[in-house]
Design a protein with these regions (language model features):
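General helical secondary-structure elements
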Residues: 5-8, 31, 35, 188
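Leu/Val/Ala/Ile-rich N-terminal alpha-helices, chiefly Sec-type signal peptides and the beginnings
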Residues: 14, 26-116
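N-terminal intrinsically disordered, acidic low-complexity segments at the extreme N-terminus
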Residues: 1-2
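Extended amphipathic alpha-helical interaction segments
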Residues: 102, 106-212
């Protein structure tokens, strides 16, 4: 009788031990999962808070496994977005753009200004293409297309969607903000193009004297 009780107590103890082990394993897995998700949340929030017009995306991947793939995809996408944004805005900071109306350039490229006008045409096309790309990159369909073909399951696609659409898409520039920036850049390009075109058309009626444009007295 006592042997049977001992056997029952032994089986019960074994069951309890197994249950405890399973619970601990489950808790351990849950902890690891939450830590990985926490890393994704942290990195997405960090990108959302950055000054996208000035800063660069940290491409270090802190998560691992499928979570790491999600983080890498997020950062690759946002790096492309940030680089495109900075390229679109960067034309105004280019030395060549700033020097278009300098005495040195007026003398070197005048009086027809073929190189300067071609440069402005090129920059206009590049800026327009960049702004169109930025608009497209903010669309949900384009965002989700970046994770397709990565060979990861629906769970990780869900995490990607959550980070991108809930945290990062709202941090992207709105259509109105992009249009304002685009108009400002176009206005700067157009003002220089207009002046250089005018000088090219009137090239018989002006000359550069001591770094200044002097027109004929009757002009």
């Amino acid at each position: 009788m006592q042997k049977k009780k001992k056997k029952k107590r032994g089986r019960k103890a074994a069951v309890i031990i197994i249950v405890v082990v399973l619970v601990l394993l489950a808790l351990g897995v849950a902890y690891l999962v939450l830590r990985q998700i926490g890393r994704l949340d942290r990195e997405a929030s960090r990108i959302a808070r950055m000054d996208m017009a000035e800063e660069t995306v940290d491409r270090t991947v802190y998560a691992s496994g499928g979570y790491g793939q999600v983080e890498d995809t997020i950062k690759a996408y946002m790096e492309e977005y940030v680089n495109t944004l900075q390229a679109a805005r960067g034309v105004l900071q280019e030395e060549e753009f700033s020097n278009l109306l300098s005495a040195d350039n007026l003398e070197a490229d005048g009086p027809g200004f073929e190189a300067s006008l071609a440069y402005l045409e090129e920059k206009q096309a590049e800026a327009d293409a960049d702004f169109e790309k930025l608009l497209k990159m903010a669309e949900e369909e384009e965002i989700m297309a970046a994770i397709e073909g990565k060979g990861i399951n629906a769970y990780f696609r869900f995490l990607y969607r959550r980070e991108m659409l809930d945290t990062l898409q709202p941090a992207m520039f709105t259509e109105e903000e992009l249009q304002t920036a685009r108009d400002s850049i176009n206005a700067s390009i157009e003002s220089r193009r207009g002046l250089l075109t005018f000088l090219a058309e009137q090239q018989e009626h002006w000359e550069l004297v001591n770094g200044r444009v002097n027109f004929d007295a009757d002009e």
